[in-house]
Amino acid sequence: MNKSKRLFTKSKRSFRRRLPPIQSGDRIDYRNMSLISRFISEQGKILSRRVNRVTLKQQRLITIAINQARILSLLPFLNNQKQFERSESTPRTTSLRTRKK
């Protein structure tokens, strides 16, 4: 290989493949709260397939299980915990502004 072509070749970097979030023995069920809670955001929304790194079939089963758990009130539909609380309230100025004509 001559020098001009060698500049454009990329070095092959080794990478470690991540473990799948659902193993073959895991059962996707509405009662398995430890598994289901991994696929829900802090606001209580179902995370997407790309974020979860699961297959389409697994994502469908997760969605069904989460919806069943919500209906049976095992999971909340929304998680409305206030993350930002006011430390001190600032008083507003009550002076009246008058227009000059």
UniProtKB/Swiss-Prot annotation:
Main location per the UniProt record: plastid
Keywords: Chloroplast, Plastid, Ribonucleoprotein, Ribosomal protein, RNA-binding, rRNA-binding
Subcellular location, record wording: Plastid, Chloroplast
Biological processes annotated in GO: translation
One Pfam short name: Ribosomal_S18
Gene Ontology molecular functions: small ribosomal subunit rRNA binding; structural constituent of ribosome
The UniProt record lists the keyword NADP: no
Entry keyword RNA-binding: yes
One Gene Ontology term, aspect cellular component: chloroplast
Quaternary structure note: Part of the 30S ribosomal subunit.
UniProt-listed NCBIfam families: S18 (TIGR00165)
HAMAP family: Ribosomal_bS18
Family: Belongs to the bacterial ribosomal protein bS18 family.
Name of the featured protein: Small ribosomal subunit protein bS18c
Lineage of the species this protein comes from: Eukaryota, Viridiplantae, Streptophyta, Embryophyta, Tracheophyta
Gene from which this protein is expressed: rps18
